[in-house]
Amino acid sequence: MTNEELYRQYLSGDTEAFERLYLQMQGFIASVAKDAAQSFGCSDKETLDELCAEGALELCKCLSTGEYDEERGKLTTYLHPFLRGKMYRYLIINHKVIFDYLFKSSYMPV
């Protein structure tokens, strides 16, 4: 069953569809977490686990709003910027990686 079909079932009140959708999306969440961690140079297992947990919470939040419009694209396309943004914010706040990243690179703010 596709993500979009499970999402429609969840919106119609099928709580088991949400569980199946979450299980189906775990690989996608892990992929976004890996990309986010690598962007900031911190891809240890503990950080990846934390990012996956943050991603799961953001997934729940995004799905519960009911704002996803299937006609505008796939569910993963809709979710990706939300998950990535949540993970970036988590890294910046909890790991202060933005400062390390800026000072290790040649970038100097004006």
PLM regions and their residue ranges:
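Alpha-helical promoter-recognition and RNA polymerase-docking modules of transcription initiation factors
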Residues: 1-98
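Internal acidic/polar
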Residues: 100-110
